[in-house]
Amino acid sequence: MFNRPKGTRDFAPSEMKKRKIIENKLKSVFMAYNFNEINTPTFEYFELLSKKTGEDIRKQLFVFKDHGNREMGLRPEITSSVVRFYINELKNLPKPQKLFYFANCFRYEQPQAGRYREFWQMGCELLGSKNPIADAEVINLAMDGLNKINMDYEIHIGHLGVLKGVFEEFGLTEDEELKIRRLIDKEDYENLEKCLIELEENKNIIIKDIIFSVLNSKGTVEEVIGNLKEILKNYPKSIEALNNLEEIMEFVKRNNYIINLGIARGLDYYTGMVFEVYGKKEGARQVCGGGRYDNLIELFEGAPTPAVGFAYGFDRIMLNIDDFEVEDKRILIVPIKKDKKLLKECLIIADKLREMEKIVEVDLMNRKLNKALNYANTVGISKVIMIGEKELNERKISIKDMETGEQKLIDLEELSNI
């Protein structure tokens, strides 16, 4: 017997129906905002996948060589592929380009609840606009999607330009800034404090209290931005970032958000507004993240292009929504006598119903009627059509509602009413 690879899953039909319902609801929201769906390859050149984060990503990827000895990798996320696609094919089209995707991704990490080696992402990229309303649109879109599927969540919104403005004002070296960024990204505040104290002693500066004032800022727009504008009044780039965040929030249509300047996701990647969404089930796991990344397309050797986007962790979303029943409207057609004439009529009626977009199954097991009804009841089929010779001669069929037990004769012309 073969087992599936570690960190992967099989989805039974009942689970796939639920996943497909949630997928389609989320996609409908992207399309309502006029985002267009695209698809990209499951594997890319390793050079592309490592461009954003460097060689360190290798141990997290599934890397292999093709028959031409070229190094490839299974995609760990979709944005790099979208950027490549944009630079190669879409850069000359009218702006903004509004793209969305839904695809499986792969990371070689230790499997645990809500974390797999194969997982699904759904997300979007809005390319070509630096207008604050573009930032607000992707935040609104992310919230609208989760509201569409009735998920209980909490959204935190921040701006990396505030911290970056502090770094710039103190004239830190590249290595010093990188060390601080990594500690913030890991939320290793104990070692961050030690690092900042050491910097203060070596450079005769006061930076620790400023950094922690930013990281600990959480609350409403008025509370956070008003307070930080006073603390950072001598840091022009930080003030510029706070003004930008304030303008973005004017266009965010709901107020059930938390301004959180402690968000430090992807300090090497994002350039401005960032946000994270946490589900309120399953230990408040993050289910969505995104922000502005105006330097990424240039990093991939394209022309400088402003960009903003986000991705849902689809598997975590499925863990965070309440279980629901899938409405089952399948129909089973059963010939009462097992002869070819009746079976052919069953197939003709099945085709007519399928043309009406009904989900129809014809009994393929030559079951007796009572066993066919038992089968329908076991697998959750909603209606059974029974076709007998006498009824057929009268242009009638018998139909049984498996939920209510009601059975009636109807004219063949009434098929569309089933």
Swiss-Prot record:
Keywords: Aminoacyl-tRNA synthetase, ATP-binding, Cytoplasm, Ligase, Nucleotide-binding, Protein biosynthesis. It catalyses: tRNA(His) + L-histidine + ATP = L-histidyl-tRNA(His) + AMP + diphosphate + H(+). One of its GO terms (cellular component) is cytoplasm. Its EC number is 6.1.1.21. PROSITE patterns: AA_TRNA_LIGASE_II (PS50862). It is found in: Cytoplasm. The keyword ATP-binding applies. It comes from the Archaea. Pfam families: HGTP_anticodon, tRNA-synt_His. It is an enzyme of class 6 (ligase). GO terms for molecular function: ATP binding; histidine-tRNA ligase activity. GO terms for biological process: histidyl-tRNA aminoacylation; L-histidine biosynthetic process. Belongs to the class-II aminoacyl-tRNA synthetase family. PANTHER family: HISTIDINE--TRNA LIGASE, MITOCHONDRIAL-RELATED, HISTIDYL-TRNA SYNTHETASE. This is Histidine--tRNA ligase. It comes from Methanococcus aeolicus (strain ATCC BAA-1280 / DSM 17508 / OCM 812 / Nankai-3). The lineage of its organism: Archaea, Methanobacteriati, Methanobacteriota, Methanomada group, Methanococci.
